[in-house]
Design a protein with these regions (language model features):
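Conserved class I S-adenosyl-L-methionine
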Residues: 1-41, 52-56, 73-76, 80-85, 138-170
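Class I SAM-dependent methyltransferase SAM/SAH-binding core
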Residues: 42-46, 50-99
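Conserved Class I S-adenosyl-L-methionine
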Residues: 50, 190-264
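A short acidic, Gly/Pro-enriched loop at the edge of an enzyme's catalytic core
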Residues: 98-110
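A short SAM/SAH-binding and catalytic strip from SAM-dependent methyltransferases
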Residues: 108-121
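A short glycine-rich, Lys/Arg-flanked "PGG" loop and its adjoining helix->strand segment in the class I
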Residues: 123-135
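Short alpha-helix
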Residues: 171-187
C-alpha cells in the first residue's frame, strides 16, 4: 500500500490542524535555542503539507527543503511562501519519503510531523531520513496536538464504520513509540521533550467537530465509501446532538506539543 496523499484535503487542512500560537511559539523557541540556525542551517521536512511548520522555521533563519506527495499541498505551500517573500529559503519538491531524491548526509535536521502514521513502508522512510542526515544530524518527531479534532468522536466514527463492514487501511504506525523502537534497533538514541508551557486546552464546538467529519476533513475518512460515511455521520449526529444541551455546546480537549529527538 502506498503512502497516503492529502490531495483533496487542502481546503480545510490548516483550519482543522490548529494549535495554540503561544505554546507553538514556546516550542519553536526551545527548538531554535537547542539547534540554532547558525549551526544547523539545513532542514528537511518530508510531508511539508501547507508549510505550517516549514514557514515558521524559515522565519527563524533555517533553509528548509519541504517534500510532499500531494501536489495540491505543495502548490499551497509554495503560494504561502511567496506571499511571505520566503521562497528563497524554502524549496518545495514533490517526492515520497520512502525514496528521497536527495544526497546522503546533506541535512542537519529532519522534522517529521505526524508523518509515519500515513506511510505503509514507514521503516523505509525512517532509513531514508537517517541517510540524508549528516553524522551529527537529528531526526525530530514533532507532535502538534489534535487541532480541531475531538478524539472520542473520531474513534466513534471508526467504530461505527467497522460495525457497517468497512475495514480501514493500515497505512503506518499506530504510535510514535514504534519509530523510537525501530531507530533504537539501528543504533540511535531518543530523547523526549515535554514542557508545561506547551500544554493547552482547546474548546471545540460540537457541531463544528461533526461538520469536519461530515466534510471528510481528516485522512481516515478519505476512502470510506459514501454509503458507509453518511450512515456513520447520521449515527454520530443522533448520538451526540440528542445528549448535548445545544448544537453550540463546546467540548474541552486537552492538547500539547511534544518533541522527540533521535540521533546517534
Amino acid at each position: 500500500m502506498a503512502s497516503l496523499s492529502f490531495d483533496g484535503l487542502t481546503a480545510q487542512y490548516d483550519q482543522t490542524r490548529t494549535f495554540d500560537p503561544f505554546c507553538f511559539r514556546q516550542a519553536m523557541d526551545w527548538l531554535t535555542e537547542r539547534f540554532p540556525p547558525s549551526q544547523f542551517p539545513n532542514v528537511l521536512e518530508p510531508g511539508v503539507g501547507t508549510g505550517r511548520i516549514a514557514l515558521p522555521l524559515v522565519e527563524r533563519g533555517y533553509q528548509v527543503t519541504g517534500l510532499d506527495i500531494s501536489e495540491e499541498m505543495l502548490n499551497l505551500c509554495a503560494a504561502q511562501s511567496r506571499a511571505l517573500e520566503a521562497d528563497s529559503m524554502l524549496c518545495c519538491l514533490r517526492a515520497d519519503a520512502v525514496r528521497l531524491p536527495l544526497r546522503s548526509m546533506s541535512f542537519d535536521l529532519c522534522v517529521a510531523v505526524h508523518l509515519f502514521y500515513f506511510i505503509s513502508d514507514w521503516q523505509a522512510a525512517v532509513r531514508e531520513m537517517l541517510r540524508v542526515l549528516n553524522p551529527f544530524g537529528t531526526l525530530i518527531l514533532l507532535h502538534t496536538g489534535f487541532g480541531a479534532e475531538v478524539p472520542h468522536l473520531n474513534e466513534r466514527y471508526q467504530e461505527i464504520a467497522k460495525e457497517l463492514g468497512y475495514a480501514f487501511p493500515d497505512y503506518g504506525v499506530r504510535s510514535t513509540s514504534e519509530v523510537v523502537e525501530y531507530t533504537a534497533s539501528l543504533g540511535y538514541a531518543a530523547e523526549r521533550v515535554d514542557q508545561p508551557e506547551w500544554e493547552w486546552m482547546t474548546k471545540i464546538n460540537l457541531q463544528d467537530a461533526l461538520n469536519h467529519l461530515r466534510d471528510r476533513a481528516y485522512s481516515f475518512t478519505k476512502d470510506v465509501p459514501d454509503a458507509v460515511h453518511w450512515a456513520v455521520i447520521d449515527g454520530l449526529q443522533h448520538e451526540n446532538l440528542k445528549e448535548a444541551a445545544s448544537p453550540a455546546a463546546e467540548i474541552e480537549v486537552p492538547n500539547h506539543i511534544s518533541i522527540i529527538l533521535i540521533r546517534q
